[in-house]
Amino acid sequence: MGTSPRSIETRHRLPASIEDLYKRKVQRSKTKDVEKPFHLSIQDRSSRCKFSFLKLILLVTISATFVMLLYSPEVYNTSHLSGSGARWIWGGSDPRYISNIDTDWDDILKITEKMIGKNEFQGIGLVNFNNTEISNWKHNFHDATHVVLHLEHAANNVTWESLYPEWIDEEEETEVPVCPSLPSLVSPGTRLNLIAVKLPCRNGDNWSRDVARLHLQFAAAGLATSFKGNYPVYVLFITNCFPIPNLFTCKELIGHEGNVWLYRPNLSVLREKVQLPVGSCELALPMRGKELVYNGNAPREAYATILHSAHVYVCGAIAAAQSIRMSGSSRDLVILVDETISEYHKSGLEAAGWKVRKIQRIRNPKAEKDAYNEWNYSKFRLWQLTDYDKIIFIDADLLILRNIDFLFGMPEITATGNNATLFNSGVMVVEPSNCTFQLLMDHINEIESYNGGDQGYLNEIFTWWHRIPRHMNFLKHFWIGDEEEKKQMKTTLFGAEPPILYVLHYLGLKPWLCFRDYDCNWNADIFHEFASDVAHAKWWKVHDAMPELLHQFCLLQSKQKAQLEWDRRQAEIANYTDGHWRIKVKDHRLNKCIDNLCNWKSMLRHWGESNWTDNEFFTPTPPTVATSSLSAL
């Protein structure tokens, strides 16, 4: 007793507008390696001059050394790589790129013979293998042409933090964000239909955020898409850790044995992916310009959200649906609900336009019992919506102010930045796939989430993601360090008509759990950073546009009314200077009772006592909304 549904996930305290406080700019220096040609000149000698015996020995030694280098497997064969001179495979030892795992040739042969037939490979490109492994490739696939591909290593100052900075200047006020350069593989003059790459996999929790590992996979993808013609190109990785799941997808995985992964990528789709920035160091979509337009395949695209263990978000989901329709989108709306959501509440969701699908909850094995994050891995069920090609997931506590259908044209995972190198999962593009769902489930016992929730877990799986402007998931939040000018700028964005923001994400206490008269975040000091009367009024404007039939799903329980009054009294005692505690509440919901203890004021006499339970505040379940009454919607 004495607590309200105010649990806030960690992500809600980490707004996309990180730049307002930190403004960390990554200094990038461009380095260019200059190769100095190795010249070996022998001057003509006069017919009258004779070499001494010592000079003759020296000449023979140099010649023998040159011949050995020329035929060494460590260098390029110029007949295999047009326009390229002899180069070393490693270009010098770089520990970032070295992989010490053993190559299991039985697994390689098993996969290639079963899935393709090893004799089908006319040309095999080899990346990041040592001399012994190259010899084994030639021995096991002796009918193929083998090309040893050289990849210049990334500069030492290219770090994961420079590829995925916490903040970039999206508005280009002081600089144009530019990603660090990662060298590409040069397309050889011969046809390749298999590109084999050996990937490093560091020990430790952060193995998936590895510049060399990303570089090798991105380079392989770029080379695969560079070939002309309508023939398949296979990509084979040797690694103990799974490859980037949204660059080379599990739907394209045709064979996996041990540490061998064989893909047949969709080259058209992959070609679009490699055109995107390599990290979140640049926007994947423009900040400004003409209104973004996307047609796509509407029947195979949907907005989706999820409700589990909390009917208090039903009102928020209904308002979110209303905002999507007001933005002009006609895409399907799909909501996943568990068994805790009553038939009454499901009928309200359906009346609002949501296609309701019941799911079985997924427990977070690392969460405490009854904790806020105990069941939030249920979000993984989104990947089982395989009757859709693309999903735009939205949290149930936001409003769509402008049409964002164009995000259906973006790949998985497209999202706004959160903090550090991470994305905010409150709005994200998902590509449903049963095998991706299985990937998520396979690792829930081993992968640690930074915030204990689904957002942290997804950030460990999908480390390669695409940044969109924060206006597409703008958090209702003011940093303590925000100057008044910055606060006023945000307030202007919250209330702008026509809207400037695409999405407004309501953090802190939710608008429908406050009285509509003002934002109740003002009455608790720990929530002041989320308080905005302008944003609050914006939400209620959408609420009032909903069919009146749906307003009943936003009524307040008696316990919540008591909580709001308790917080107001505490604000009065503390004499908060904003003065919201002085405002007389006129919200008509104050006098509407939906449970069996309507005298909420009497609850305040015992507020906070530990021997109280919620049992006596049982809320009767009203009858479902009749579908016959929906004709007016």
Regions found by a protein language model. Name each.
Residues 149-151, 238, 336-338, 357-361, ...:
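Conserved beta-strand termini and adjacent loop/short-helix elements that scaffold enzyme active sites
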Residues 331-333, 389-390:
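Short active-site oxyanion
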Residues 2-313, 319, 444-633:
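A glycosyltransferase accessory/donor-loop signature
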Residues 323-331:
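Short, acidic, metal-binding catalytic loop of nucleotide-sugar glycosyltransferases
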Residues 343, 350-367, 371-434:
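GT-A fold catalytic core of metal-dependent nucleotide-sugar glycosyltransferases
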Residues 80, 337-346:
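Glycosyltransferase specificity loop/lid
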Residues 219, 315-318, 322, 347, ...:
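Amphipathic alpha-helical interface elements that mediate macromolecular binding in regulatory proteins
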Residues 235, 333-334:
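Hydrophobic/aromatic residues located in beta-strands of well-ordered beta-sheets
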